[in-house]
Amino acid sequence: MVRSFHVIARKICTVAVLFIIAIPVFTQEIGVQLYSFRKQLPGNVPVMLEKISKMGIKELEGGGSYGLPPGEFKSLLKKNNLKVVSVGADFQQLAKDPQASVDLAKTYGAKYVVVFWIPHTDVFTIDDAKNAVNVFNSAGKLLKENGIALCYHAHGYEFGAYGKGTLFDYLAENLNPAYANFEMDVFWVKHPGQDPVALLQKYPSRFPLMHLKDRKTGTEGNQKGEADVETNVVLGSGDVGIAAIMKAAKKAGVKHYFIEDESSRSVEQVPRSLAYLASLKQE
């Protein structure tokens, strides 16, 4: 009897260990940034949303309705079990009329508003950064009062040197985390010569959103926010280091992930990227 108990116990432990090993690196849904399908959606929204849903995707980042009335677009989202988690906002509009971003987010039931670009001349300066801090802290306060979180998506020009760090450090240190945080695009951290894992570790809990995008190995980077979209490759096949990033992102508290594939091959590549992410296991 005792021996049988020990045998059963060992089997249970073995199954438990195997179960733990099989747990994916991440448990959150993997969504997609609709910009990935910017060429396929216009005039073809019902078909594309159905195709996206059949990929196993449930979460979207977007904000536009691609020529359809918002109500009709929302009906198609519901039909395909899709929800918009975050919407985009123009920096200048956010500065002048933050309520418009609140209204857009509420239209789609989104919990996040993301700004993707800070207007500047050839070089992003400390004055540009200071202005952005003022705009984001002010607008972010209004958004928070309406149950919406504001994030900024860097594009590489923010990593120019400033003081003992970078202008991104200035943004991170001066944005009130209660009002404004970040969406990390791992491509646009790697492209200007930074380490996405190190940045996640440096600023844990400041990146609730993440764009997953890989870069063709050997691509030359820059700090201008410029890149050939055809250098976007299937996740795991480039030089960004997606596997390590996913582990670090989980520890850093990333809440929502969106594949963004800007290449002309996005319809073919996104399912392959999803398959790669599903293959990742804890060590």
Predicted regions and their residues:
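C-terminal helical cap(s) of enzyme catalytic domains, especially alpha/beta-barrels
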Residues: 266-283
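Conserved, mostly hydrophobic/aromatic
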Residues: 32, 52, 60, 77, ...
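N-terminal pre-domain/capping segments
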Residues: 26-112, 280-283
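Hydrophobic faces of well-ordered beta-strands that scaffold small-molecule active sites
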Residues: 30-33, 60-62, 84-89, 113-115, ...
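Acidic/histidine-rich catalytic cores of soluble enzymes
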Residues: 145-239
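Active-site acidic/histidine proton-transfer and metal-coordination neighborhood
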Residues: 50, 58-59, 91-181, 267
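Acidic-and-aromatic substrate-binding clefts and catalytic sites of carbohydrate-active enzymes
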Residues: 38-43, 59-71, 89-97, 120-124, ...
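Bacterial Sec-dependent N-terminal signal peptides
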Residues: 1-29
